[in-house]
C-alpha cells in the first residue's frame, strides 16, 4: 500500500504569523516650557496610565519660543499590552473612530491627537487644568522581536513588514474605523 501525500493549500490570510497586534502605545504631552505646567501634565499622564512618565528635553535653543537647550519641555509615557488597547480605545472614542489617511505612516504605524484629556474619562481638576495629548501606535507582527533583540539579531523580511495599507485595514476591521481621504 503506497502512502498518499496530500498537498494542503493554506490561505495566507489565516496564517497566525501575519496577525497584527499593538506593540506599544506612546502618549505625549508637549507643554513647551519647564516648571509647574509640565509637572501638572505629568500628573495627567500618571492618572491616565498608572505609570511614572518620563520628561523630554529640548534638543536645541529656540529664542523666539523661549526654549533653552536641555530644558525639560515635554512628558511622555509608553504603554504596552492590554492597558495600551484600553487607552487606545478611549482615545479613538474621542475621535469617533475617524482618522485621516495622513495619520498612517509608511511603516504601518499611526498617530493622532486629542484636544482635551478630560474627554478620556478623567475627572476635571481645576488645579491641574486641561491638556491635549498625542497618541502614537506602533503595530507589529509575531517575529518582529528578531530586529530588536541584543543577541543574534536579524532583520524582518520584506514580505513580513507592515505597510500603510495593512495598518489601515487592521484599523478598519478591529475598530470599525472610518478613514477619511483629505484632498489638498
Swiss-Prot record:
What is the name of the gene encoding this protein? Answer: RpL11
Q: Which family does it belong to?
A: Belongs to the universal ribosomal protein uL5 family.
Listed name of the protein: Large ribosomal subunit protein uL5
The family database entries (InterPro entries) matched by this protein are listed as:
Ribosomal_uL5 (IPR002132), Ribosomal_uL5_C (IPR031309), Ribosomal_uL5_CS (IPR020929), Ribosomal_uL5_dom_sf (IPR022803), Ribosomal_uL5_N (IPR031310)
One GO biological process term: cytoplasmic translation
The record's PROSITE patterns line, in alphabetical order, gives:
RIBOSOMAL_L5 (PS00358)
Please give the subunit comment from the record. Answer: Component of the large ribosomal subunit. Interacts with Fmr1 to form the RNA-induced silencing complex (RISC), a ribonucleoprotein (RNP) complex involved in translation regulation, other components of the complex are RpL5, Rm62, AGO2 and Dcr-1.
Enumerate the subcellular locations listed in this protein's record, separating them with semicolons. Answer: Nucleus; Cytoplasm
Which coarse location class describes where this protein primarily resides? nucleus
Short name of one Pfam family: Ribosomal_L5_C
Write out the GO cellular component annotations. cytoplasm; cytosolic large ribosomal subunit; cytosolic ribosome; nucleolus
**What exactly does this protein do?**
Component of the ribosome, a large ribonucleoprotein complex responsible for the synthesis of proteins in the cell. The small ribosomal subunit (SSU) binds messenger RNAs (mRNAs) and translates the encoded message by selecting cognate aminoacyl-transfer RNA (tRNA) molecules. The large subunit (LSU) contains the ribosomal catalytic site termed the peptidyl transferase center (PTC), which catalyzes the formation of peptide bonds, thereby polymerizing the amino acids delivered by tRNAs into a polypeptide chain.
Question: NCBIfam families from the xrefs?
Answer: PRK04219.1
Q: Which species is this record about? A: Drosophila melanogaster (Fruit fly)
- Keywords for this protein: Cytoplasm, Nucleus, Ribonucleoprotein, Ribosomal protein, RNA-binding, rRNA-binding
Q: Which domain of life is it from?
A: Eukaryota
What GO molecular function terms would the record report? Answer: RNA binding; rRNA binding; structural constituent of ribosome
Amino acid at each position: 500500500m503506497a502512502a498518499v501525500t496530500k498537498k494542503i493549500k493554506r490561505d495566507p490570510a489565516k496564517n497566525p504569523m501575519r496577525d497584527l497586534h499593538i506593540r506599544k502605545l506612546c502618549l505625549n504631552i508637549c507643554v513647551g516650557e519647564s516648571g509647574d505646567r509640565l509637572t501638572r501634565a505629568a500628573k495627567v499622564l500618571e492618572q491616565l496610565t498608572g505609570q511614572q512618565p518620563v520628561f523630554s528635553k529640548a534638543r536645541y535653543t529656540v529664542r523666539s519660543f523661549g526654549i533653552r537647550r536641555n530644558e525639560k519641555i515635554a512628558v511622555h509615557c509608553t504603554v504596552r499590552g492590554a492597558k495600551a488597547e484600553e487607552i487606545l480605545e478611549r482615545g479613538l472614542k474621542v475621535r469617533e473612530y475617524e482618522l485621516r489617511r495622513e495619520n498612517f505612516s509608511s511603516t504601518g504605524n499611526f498617530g493622532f491627537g486629542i484636544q482635551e484629556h478630560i474627554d478620556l474619562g478623567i475627572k476635571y481638576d481645576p488645579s491641574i487644568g486641561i491638556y491635549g495629548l498625542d497618541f502614537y501606535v506602533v503595530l507589529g507582527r509575531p517575529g518582529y522581536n528578531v530586529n530588536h533583540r541584543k543577541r543574534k539579531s536579524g532583520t524582518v523580511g520584506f514580505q513580513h513588514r507592515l505597510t500603510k495599507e495593512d495598518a489601515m485595514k487592521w484599523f478598519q476591521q478591529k475598530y470599525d474605523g472610518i478613514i477619511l481621504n483629505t484632498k489638498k
